[in-house]
């Protein structure tokens, strides 16, 4: 039976490991060092966001997946980039193929049509599941739904790379609809009643 826990600093090495194996290499953070990923997720341990983990049961505390969602997430990402500027520069200089791919994506995105939309106040930053862990993604999505229904949140947004077909299908199955196209990503929303 799956169980939901609040993530704390002690879980961050497991979070970084799951993140590394579940994000594709063409996603910048999918190639970051373990320590940089730990520093990234440290930003989300407090504030107006939620950071849940999924374990197989209350006795076996092995982390099978996690989700970060809530308010103020873009500001925390910006803070991480600002506070880790030197580490990020070193990372990109040692991974020039990722750096060039990022520059190319940004250049292409600057010429693409940008949809106008109003971003939801509450966003999902990340859902990641350990390889081979079955049912964890839907379990975490259910935890989000319960949290937001309890707190009377009306809508939830997220961004998904257009190339991430598996994630797009997952979010469609869970009630999300594409609202806009932004920089090679779909912005999707789910409304709660």
What are these regions (language model features)?
Residues 1-17, 71:
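A short beta-loop-alpha structural element at the N-terminal edge
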Residues 118-123, 141, 148-161:
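Conserved GNAT acetyl-CoA-binding A-motif
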């Amino acid at each position: 039976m799956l169980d939901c826990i609040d993530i704390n600093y002690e879980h961050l090495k497991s979070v970084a490991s799951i993140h590394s194996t579940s994000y594709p290499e063409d996603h910048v953070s999918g190639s970051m060092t373990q320590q940089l990923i730990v520093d990234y997720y440290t930003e989300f341990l407090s504030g107006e966001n939620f950071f849940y983990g999924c374990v197989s049961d209350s006795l076996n505390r092995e982390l099978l997946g996690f989700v970060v969602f809530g308010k103020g997430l873009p500001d925390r990402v910006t803070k991480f980039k600002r506070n880790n500027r030197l580490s990020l520069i070193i990372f990109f200089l040692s991974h020039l193929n990722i750096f060039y791919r990022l520059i190319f994506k940004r250049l292409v995105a600057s010429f693409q049509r940008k949809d106008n939309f109003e971003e939801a106040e509450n966003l999902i930053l990340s859902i990641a599941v350990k390889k081979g862990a079955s049912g964890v993604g839907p379990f975490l999505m259910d935890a989000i739904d319960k949290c937001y229904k309890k707190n009377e949140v009306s809508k939830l947004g997220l961004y998904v790379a257009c190339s991430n077909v598996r994630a797009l299908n997952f979010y469609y199955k869970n009630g999300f609809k594409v609202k806009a196209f932004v920089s090679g990503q779909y912005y999707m929303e789910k409304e709660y009643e």
